[in-house]
Amino acid sequence: MKSVLLTRNIQENNETIQEINKYNLDLRYIHCSLIKYKTLDFNINILNNYSNIIITSKYAAHILADYNLKQDIWVVGNKTKQLLGKKVIYTANNIADLIQHFPTDLYKHTIYLSSNEITQDLPNKIARHIIYNVEYLNELPISIIQEFENIRYFSKPAYRNAFKANTIRATTAYKKVFNDPSLGSTYPLEVPLGKMSIDFILLYSQNSAKTLVRLLLQNNLLQYLQDSLVIAISLKVANIVRPFIKNVVYCDNQSPHDIIKLLYENAKI
């Protein structure tokens, strides 16, 4: 059974798993949430000064979904559009697409509601207001450290044979640790026992990629990912990890859905 390292927050990881399940792939999922979000106090009245709103993240859309917004809304991504409903007048594939189609005469009448971390600046005349903070992981969770310990231990055939020969250990340790059919099977070890690995790593932002590389370097773990395939949302994200991991592919149009397509194309091989 091949394994996938999921790097977004737990809610987004679970949504990703549901999308992957549509492709009927039998995968083991490893949760490593590199980011978490903190909603800030937000005075909705500041929007009264603007006729247009730009939203490029699903989390920002969640914050605004319960408000009766009167402005025209420009978004990135279909899921963001679904959260905000009929007031969305344009849905872009990515930020570059949105900027290309956004009328320049609306810049001074527009506010961009975002996090403290953005991957691409909008034109200067567009106002920006931060409505939530993105915080990145400072150390790897114990569960991820244990995952790499398993890879380290079972990378040597002699250790795998010793484990198989130990009947008590083989039957009592490393049992299934997650039993939710909607999320697929999660095992600390693959069954039947074989060489352990993390086969795929999904990366959705430059900051997540930088965080992952930093944590792997801190723990001297990059050597165990040289056979892994990183699937990045863009060329910029791919270029961050390429000096450290040799197998990297990326999406041409920066679409989260295309990450899953690339996963499917490589996992079925």
From Swiss-Prot:
SUPFAM superfamilies: HemD-like
Cross-referenced InterPro entries: 4pyrrol_syn_uPrphyn_synt_sf, RPE1
GO molecular function, one term: uroporphyrinogen-III synthase activity
Domain of life: Bacteria
GO terms under biological process: tetrapyrrole biosynthetic process
Domain RPE1 insert, chain residue ranges per copy: 152-197
Signal peptide bounds: none
The protein, known as: Uncharacterized protein RP474
